[in-house]
Regions:
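Gram-negative outer-membrane beta-barrel proteins
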Residues: 52-60, 99-107, 122, 140, ...
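Short glycine/proline- and aromatic-enriched beta-strand/turn motifs that initiate or cap beta-hairpins
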Residues: 22-75, 145, 172, 176-177, ...
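Extracellular loop and loop/strand-boundary signature of outer-membrane beta-barrel proteins
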Residues: 31-32, 60-67, 114-121, 206-209, ...
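Outer-membrane beta-barrel "beta-signal"
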Residues: 256-268
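Short sequence motifs at beta-strands and strand-loop junctions characteristic
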Residues: 38, 68-73, 122-127, 209-216, ...
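Glycine- and aromatic-enriched membrane insertion/assembly motifs of diderm outer-membrane
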Residues: 41-57, 63-118
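Membrane-embedded beta-strand positions in outer-membrane beta-barrel channels/transporters
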Residues: 73-79, 90, 129-133, 220, ...
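Outer-membrane beta-barrel transmembrane domain signature
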Residues: 84, 88, 130, 134-231, ...
Length: 268
């Protein structure tokens, strides 16, 4: 139901400016440089960039706040601008794919033994985002302009997992796959011998206090520059408005996501 609701909102916000733009008849300005800017913002944008994000968990009773390890990754997507005020104000939407990862690689000494094990693990996340932004353009020089945008991005999580494995001895490999959305754990190998990988992950606080929701509404802003009516670079920050915890845990704790993005794009 929630997915249908978000899809309807996105569709309405995309179609509304499209209809307004169509009614204007695509009138091109007479000034040559302004005309180039008009063409630039009417094109389809292909963007690729670096993403750095972090989760913030807060205890509602004590206000204690814990920040997760930083996650790095990339984003790739398509954008489209629709003119609201000619050559100045635009509505931007599109579809972005976001991948991020936090790797861990360390040696652990097994208590009461002379043995040590090497643990290799990742936290991986995949998201889809639909930006719904207002974008303002400032003309600086003939071939250079600045843009400022702000607004929400509808975010849907495709996957969020911990993937850890270790080798206790030759031929004895254990692994744990934990799904943060449904709370399911898949274990392979011996988890009850000298070293229990699943218990180690629990002791390290890797399992969240409850399952996480897939959906978020990220509110943010960015500043950018475009060059020669073709290339565009942007730097922005977004913060999640929804508590990612679900069910009863959401009454005691809140988890929100912050994200920096540095991207470059080209319009066609």
């Amino acid at each position: 139901m929630k997915l249908r609701f978000l899809t309807i909102i996105a569709a309405l916000m995309v179609l509304a400016p499209l209809e307004v733009d169509a009614q204007r008849g695509h009138i091109r300005p007479s000034h040559p440089h302004i005309g180039d800017r008009y063409t630039f913002f009417r094109g389809i944008g292909v963007t690729f960039g670096y993403v750095n994000s972090q989760y913030y968990t807060q205890d509602k009773a004590t206000d204690d706040r814990i920040s997760s390890d930083l996650m790095n990754g990339f984003t790739i997507g398509l954008t489209k601008d629709f003119a609201l005020l000619p050559h100045a104000l635009y509505f931007q939407t599109g579809l972005n794919y976001i991948y991020q990862n936090d790797s861990r690689n360390e040696n652990i000494k097994i208590p009461l033994t002379d043995m040590s094990v090497r643990i290799v693990g990742d936290r991986e996340e995949h998201h889809l985002g639909i930006p719904l932004r207002l974008k303002y353009d400032v003309h600086i020089l003939d071939n250079i302009g600045l843009t400022f945008d702000a607004g929400p991005t509808l975010l849907m999580g495709l996957s969020s997992k911990y993937l850890y494995k270790t080798r206790l001895s030759e031929g004895m490999v254990t692994s744990v796959d934990y799904n943060l959305y449904n709370g399911k754990v898949k274990s392979n190998g011996n988890q009850s011998g000298d070293f229990n990988l699943e218990q180690w992950m629990d002791d390290k606080g890797m399992y969240p206090k409850g399952r996480l929701g897939r959906f978020d509404v990220m509110l943010g802003a960015s500043v950018g520059a475009h060059f020669f009516h073709i290339l565009e670079v942007r730097l922005g920050y977004d913060y999640g408005l929804l508590n990612r915890y679900r069910n009863d845990v959401a009454d005691m704790y809140s988890m929100h996501r912050g994200q920096f993005t540095l991207s470059a794009g080209k319009r066609f």
